[in-house]
Amino acid sequence: MRDQFICLALLLCALHSACGLYFHISETERKCFIEEVPDETTVIVNYKVELYDPRSNGFMPSSPGIGMHVEVRDSDDKIILSRVYSSQGRISFTSHTPGEHVICMYSNSTAWFSGAQLRVHLDIQVGEHAIDYANVAQKEKLTELQLRIRQLLDQVEQITKEQNYQRYREERFRHTSESTNSRVLWWSLAQTVVLVCMGFWQMRHLKSFFEAKKLV
């Protein structure tokens, strides 16, 4: 029983994670990240842009003139978000189709900051990790017990979405495998038919050749 509880706790922690990182980009450089998201799932992206200062040999908070263009594409390669944000902000969107969502970011180029080196801090939160439960408790006036129940219900809902997404991936993989096997089978049959036809043609050609030479 204890082992089952530990496994369930690990599963709940691993399902929809929040990842924090930073990366360096230059002017016009584009960075993209792929996030696998079930359908009807909230994704929140927190970011902060810092500008390299050669005098201090470090990164400082960027000026208002520098922002980030953010573009999000769903698994069908449809743009679901595309706009320019300030140098620090919070982006939120909800997936409507399951699969890989591509989040791309690049700086809005200006002549003043042309060629500047930027450092972008990025934090992507998916699923129940994207919910601000402190804000929810304050707005809905929930007790600690009610808030905990709300969190558990959200986790169960995310587990259900994750299971549905895994079944969706398995179905796509099975369909791809069946389609590949079918193409391989038909290609093998086509090769066999071509070889039989070539052999039949060669036999007829040899027979005609021998008859013309009066060897048969």
UniProtKB/Swiss-Prot annotation:
Cellular component terms (Gene Ontology): endoplasmic reticulum membrane
Ranges spanned by the short sequence motif Prevents secretion from ER, renumbered to the chain: 213-216
Transmembrane listed as a keyword: yes
Family the UniProt entry places it in: Belongs to the EMP24/GP25L family.
This protein's encoding gene: eca
Signal peptide: 1-20
Single biological process term from Gene Ontology: dorsal/ventral pattern formation
Topological domain ranges for the Cytoplasmic compartment: 204-216
Keywords: Coiled coil, Developmental protein, Endoplasmic reticulum, Membrane, Signal, Transmembrane, Transmembrane helix
Protein's cellular compartments: Endoplasmic reticulum membrane
Entry superkingdom: Eukaryota
Protein name: Transmembrane emp24 domain-containing protein eca
Family matches, as PROSITE patterns: GOLD
Residue intervals passing through the bilayer: 183-203
Domain called GOLD: residue spans: 30-126
